[in-house]
Amino acid sequence: MKKNIFAAATLCTLFFVGCNNNPETVVEEFYKANKANDFEKALSYTNIAKEEREEVIDILSDMGMVIHEYKVLGSTIDEGDTTATVDLHLVTSSAFYPDSLADDIKVPCVKSGRQWQVKLI
């Protein structure tokens, strides 16, 4: 009985992980982690190589950017199903610009294997 429950739980997990693999979800999770200052997790949603992430984390920490809010507005997946653009409304501030700045931006994404990633390089 325990084996059946474990197998069912594993299948459900794999199913839901696969369902969330779209450009909008990846961008949402990327900005959610950034807002929480969890840069290591945020970079796990990008195409930055693992060995380069520590340097990028230092840069992000030094920037002092604060994400107040973000909202995915939509996305476009290109014909080849390998690149996408996610439209995002973003409100930020930083030590350099303490007043909130709101902007609609386009976040590029790339597909690596079956996984979508935020394209930073």
Tell what function each PLM region has:
Residues 1-5:
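Positively charged n-region of N-terminal signal peptides that target proteins for export
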Residues 6-11:
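Sec-dependent N-terminal signal peptides
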Residues 15-18:
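C-terminal motif of bacterial Sec signal peptides marking the signal peptidase cleavage site
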Residues 21:
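Short, conserved catalytic or interaction motifs in soluble domains
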Residues 24-25, 34-87, 97:
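Short solvent-exposed beta->alpha transition segments
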Residues 77-121:
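Exposed beta-sheet edge and beta->alpha loop/turn motif
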